[in-house]
């Protein structure tokens, strides 16, 4: 009789355990520390990513896995030191092609784009002879996605400064970034007045600052024409959401023209910093082998 009771108790225990099953992962990204997926099949997904003197010290094997895992339609890169190394990397990533400019010998700007979803119509640089505001000339990419045209303007602004705009010093870092914004605004309003424009990159300054030393006022003063899609991050920065966490700074930005306001809203106003270090399972490993910047991405619908 005791053996029968034991068998019954074991059966009851097994039934209870099997009924519990596995926890259902409602949001895989929050539960899987290696998940860095950003893009969807129904949106135009654009990312900016400073790769910190690529390929110096870069874990190429990991980076070649991370890029398709992000699942962006276009990624704009900064700090590409070796043209051939970047092109070789692109050749090893299925379904992606590369554009790298030659306007500078180092700290180049570049793009990777998904050839299944994006067509590149044209690529060119502007302000090549204006190195004071633009130590790296802006790199434009004219693309078609879902039968619509878009203009991306990839930038890497002058770094450093002291949170003071000295208009009397032509080499003042903040003044140079301020001039870069003013000239980009002029170029867009003059040459691309009705285009869907995305200005993005490592802009090396913060957008949520007092007017007296905010270098982005030429854009911020025109809310009917421009919007920084990452502004919610900038006004509430934390270690977990900024693009440059080592100094708790958010300096990588995505600006859209008013032709994209509805598309941004239609995609849920979704712009965020991608915690790419999750792929490496630690910030220190990521910072040492990939970059000291996190990628920032935006979704647009059509």
Regions of interest found by a model, annotated:
Residues 9-18:
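Bacterial N-terminal signal peptides
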Residues 20-97, 103-108, 178-185, 196, ...:
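N-terminal, active-site-proximal structural segment of metallo-dependent hydrolase catalytic domains
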Residues 22, 27-32, 124-125, 131-135, ...:
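Metal-dependent phosphoester-hydrolase catalytic domains
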Residues 59-75, 136-239:
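Extracytoplasmic, non-cytosolic globular domains
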Residues 80-158:
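Structured beta-strand-rich core segments of catalytic domains in phosphoester-bond hydrolases
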């Amino acid at each position: 009789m005791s053996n029968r009771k034991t068998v019954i108790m074991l059966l009851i225990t097994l039934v209870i355990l099997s009924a519990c099953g596995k926890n259902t992962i409602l949001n895989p990204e929050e539960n899987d520390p290696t998940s860095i997926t950003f893009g969807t099949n129904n949106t135009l997904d654009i990312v900016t990513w400073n790769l910190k003197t690529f390929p110096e010290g870069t874990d190429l094997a990991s980076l070649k896995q991370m890029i398709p895992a992000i699942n962006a339609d276009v990624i704009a890169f900064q700090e590409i030191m070796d043209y051939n190394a970047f092109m070789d990397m692109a050749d090893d990533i299925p379904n992606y092609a590369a554009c790298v400019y030659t306007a500078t010998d180092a700290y180049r700007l570049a793009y990777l784009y998904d050839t299944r979803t994006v067509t590149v119509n044209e690529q060119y640089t502007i302000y090549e002879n204006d190195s004071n505001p633009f130590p790296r000339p802006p790199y434009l990419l004219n693309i078609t996605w879902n039968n619509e045209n878009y203009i991306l303007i990839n930038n890497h602004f002058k770094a450093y400064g002291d949170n003071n705009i000295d208009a009397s010093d032509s080499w003042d870092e903040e003044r140079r970034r301020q001039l870069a914004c003013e000239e980009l605004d002029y170029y867009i309003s003059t040459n691309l007045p009705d285009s869907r424009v995305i200005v993005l990159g490592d802009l090396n300054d913060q957008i949520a600052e007092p007017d007296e030393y905010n270098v982005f006022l030429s854009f911020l003063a025109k809310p009917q024409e421009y919007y920084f899609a990452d502004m919610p991050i900038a006004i509430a920065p934390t270690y977990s959401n900024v693009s440059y966490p080592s100094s708790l700074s958010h300096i990588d930005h995505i600006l859209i023209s008013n032709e994209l306001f509805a598309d941004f809203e239609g995609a849920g106003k979704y712009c965020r910093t991608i915690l790419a270090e999750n792929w490496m399972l630690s910030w220190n490993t990521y910072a040492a082998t990939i970059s000291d910047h996190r990628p920032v991405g935006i979704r647009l619908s059509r």
